[in-house]
């Protein structure tokens, strides 16, 4: 469950601008603020089932966006490459502060 939550949080971060305001609100409350379906339903004065359906549809949309655009997959690949690069620099060029500084700046862009 934690793995799914983490994945949804990343997908939400990447694709939230493609969602409707209601979808953004429900996903934010459910995944980021850890609200229950019942709490969201109460806040928006809708049924728990309506919230559940909206979240499930939105999850499917986020997965579909990722399947087409691959932003999260590419992010993970860049993260792994940066880690390998940092390790290589630390082992081969431990005194090159400028090189390490450049890698750290690349990491900040992520």
Curated annotation (Swiss-Prot):
Domain of life: Bacteria
Family annotation (PANTHER family): UPF0122 PROTEIN CBO2450/CLC_2298 (PTHR40083), UPF0122 PROTEIN YLXM (PTHR40083:SF1)
Name of the featured protein: UPF0122 protein Aflv_1766
S-S pairs: none
Name of a matching Pfam family: UPF0122
Function: Might take part in the signal recognition particle (SRP) pathway. This is inferred from the conservation of its genetic proximity to ftsY/ffh. May be a regulatory protein.
InterPro entries: RNA_pol_sigma_r3/r4-like, UPF0122, UPF0122_fam_protein, WH-like_DNA-bd_sf
Family: Belongs to the UPF0122 family.
Gene3D superfamilies per the UniProt record, alphabetical: Winged helix-like DNA-binding domain superfamily/Winged helix DNA-binding domain
NCBIfam families: PRK00118.1-4, PRK00118.1-6, YlxM
